[in-house]
Amino acid sequence: MKNAYKKVRVRYPVKRPDVKRKQRGPRAETQESRFLAAAVADEISGLSPLEKKAISLLEAKNNNKAQKLLRKRLGSHKRAVAKVEKLARMLLEK
């Protein structure tokens, strides 16, 4: 059956269909409201046990260990680095 597909040839030029792309709405407004909602949620809910443990490691100058812990729990290196930076900024503010 596979060989039968190889013998089929297209005898006319194939053109890409013309599709009009939809314009996206203003992103800045939605982004600002999303950041505001996240900030309010963080302020109300407080720190999770994972964040508390990471902060205790950061206070003890174990940045590497905190990053490894966060990477394991959050799923990626990029997310862990961002969370470590956020928690370090919180420590500096206090």
Curated annotation (Swiss-Prot):
Comp. bias (Basic residues): 1-25
Disulfide bonds listed in the record: none
UniProt keyword annotations, A-Z: Cytoplasm, Ribonucleoprotein, Ribosomal protein
Keyword hit for Cytoplasm: yes
Compartment list: Cytoplasm
Keyword Transcription regulation: no
One BP term from GO: translation
Start and end residues of each stretch annotated as Disordered: 1-30
GO CC annotation: cytoplasm; ribonucleoprotein complex; ribosome
Family: Belongs to the eukaryotic ribosomal protein eL36 family.
Record text on subunit structure and interactions: Component of the large ribosomal subunit.
Protein name stated in the entry: Large ribosomal subunit protein eL36
Organism, as annotated: Encephalitozoon cuniculi (strain GB-M1) (Microsporidian parasite)
